[in-house]
Design a protein with these regions (language model features):
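Acidic, glycine/proline-rich Ca2+-coordinating loop motifs
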Residues: 1-492
Length: 492
């Protein structure tokens, strides 16, 4: 095939005319491009000016400078300031032979991990403090298997005024076997004699003081037994409606039975079946009984607003182990702070009309400083700084610090956890803290702090080398009367 070539038949004159036309076209195109560029620049400038003239004005953010002050540094007092107070074990000399029975035979049932309550009170009104030890007993299914297991009862000891106690349980009306948990003392019938309320796994018990060293069971008449399948822990008498008689708040723990316990089946590696946290047990509601003034109570738990449900599951939330009745804002009406195990703590503010509002979260008491729940158990309150600030102390599980919530100066219903700055946090972290108690042990006018400690598992060291089954109590001395001007120091 021949290659195509340009047509050479055109004359030279025609070629010159074509080149002239091309040159004129290039000039026109160049001029058009130049004016297009000018127009584009003009439009950009005009658009920029228009945008800045008509754009929405930004809201002015007012910046306020503020000075953030660090917490006041706590000065740990020198050793010479901490009193060298000694305590002596006098149980045997005092004549106390009570032995607690948790009913354990090897099944590792959760109630067995709880110690029962104890109360100092003057039951015979002779001017000295007597002692009541609440007791557990053997489980009924174990008694059927082993008839040699004899039921055990609580122990009542009368103080002779000379530091010696006499066991007067037999014949007192308290020599009854049931799986007891906690105890509350109060004169519910206003006859001048202290009465007894015992919480339990199963039905709770009310005992009216007859004044002759004997008590009678008035649970049925008083209508305060609670549910047969409930597990109640702590309780407190308090006059919630300011009518002159004592009402009754009762903490309930978890929904429990032997069958449920085995379904949960908590185990530890290297140990096997073990006592564990209540995480996988369903929660419950606390109970509130209003004293009607005639020896009877009315259950107002539902109408009082204390039945708190999980926002996520709508199931009962409470897993309560401790309660402290206290007038938080000093308005003349008693409120309740409730220590919950692995769910947030409750603060029930008295609304002065027979109902309460729950404000654990917004008060600052519900959680730790990181917004997490803890294994809260024992609870007590005190104005340990000797001023208007209220302290709420709560004993928590192992590897969790004591909580020491302190009310703020400008809002008595707002608390911050000052456990670290007050000196009780780091030293208490390792221990598993069941009971907690404010008292002035050295009589210097400042409330000190005691915790009662111990682990659930006898073989816990196999799993956690830092833990032990037996743990000593821990005593913190209030340094308020020293140059430190506050805080606590561990007493060795």
């Amino acid at each position: 095939m021949k290659d195509l070539e340009p047509n050479s038949s055109k004359s030279p004159a025609a070629s010159d005319d074509l080149e002239e036309l091309v040159d004129e076209g290039d000039a026109v195109i160049g001029l058009a491009l130049k004016w297009s560029a000018f127009a584009a620049v003009f439009l950009l400038v005009a658009g920029f000016i228009a945008y800045n003239l008509f754009k929405p004005k930004d809201k002015q953010v007012k910046v306020v400078d503020s000075i953030i002050e660090a917490p006041e540094q706590r000065v740990v007092p020198a050793k010479e300031f901490v009193p060298e107070t000694m305590f002596t074990e006098i149980t045997a000399e005092a004549g106390i032979e009570f032995e607690h029975n948790n009913g354990a035979v090897g099944d590792k049932l959760l109630p067995e991990s709880m110690g029962s309550g104890v109360a100092f009170f003057d039951f015979d009104v002779d001017g000295d403090q007597d002692l009541l030890f609440i007791n557990g007993t053997w489980w009924p299914w174990d008694i059927k298997k082993k008839p040699e297991l004899k039921p055990t009862t609580s122990g009542l000891y009368r103080n002779d005024g000379n530091g010696v106690f006499e066991d007067v349980t037999v014949g007192s009306g308290l020599d009854v076997a049931f799986y007891g948990m906690g105890v509350a003392i109060g004169d519910y019938d206003n006859d001048g004699l202290p009465d007894i309320y015992c919480t339990a796994v199963g039905s709770n018990r009310m005992y009216r003081n007859l004044g002759d060293g004997k008590f009678t069971d008035t649970t049925g008449v008083a209508r305060v037994a609670g549910g047969e399948n409930e597990w109640s822990t702590s309780a407190a008498f308090a006059d919630i409606d300011n009518d002159g008689d004592l009402d009754l708040f009762v903490c309930n723990y978890v929904r429990w039975s032997r069958e449920i316990d085995f379904e949960v089946n908590y185990t530890l590696v290297g140990v096997g079946r073990a006592y564990g946290p209540p995480t996988n047990f369903q929660g419950t509601f606390p109970s509130l009984f209003r004293n009607d003034g005639d020896g009877k109570f009315t259950d107002i738990s539902q109408s009082a607003g204390i039945q708190i449900r999980s926002s996520a599951t709508k199931a009962p939330m409470a897993k309560s182990l401790g309660v402290a009745p206290v007038d938080l804002d000093e308005d003349g009406w008693v409120d309740f702070v409730v220590a919950n195990d692995t769910v947030h703590n409750f603060v029930f503010k008295n609304k002065k009309n027979g109902t309460f509002s729950e404000m654990g979260g917004i008060s600052g008491i519900g959680f730790d400083n990181n917004g997490k729940v803890r294994g809260a158990m024992g609870i007590d309150v005190a104005r340990f700084r000797n001023d208007k600030a209220l302290g709420v102390g709560i004993g928590n599980f192992a590897n969790e610090m004591i909580a020491l919530y302190v009310s703020t100066p400008n809002n008595q219903l707002l608390f911050t956890d000052n456990a670290i700055t007050e000196g009780v946090g780091p030293d208490s972290r390792l221990l598993l803290k069941f009971g907690l108690f404010f008292f002035d042990y050295d009589l210097d006018g400042w409330q000190d702090l005691l915790t009662s400690n111990g682990h659930l598992e006898e073989e816990i060291t196999k799993v956690q080398k830092s833990q032990s089954y037996a743990q000593s109590a821990q005593l913190f001395w209030n340094c308020g009367g020293t140059p430190a001007k506050g805080g606590f120091a561990v007493v060795n």
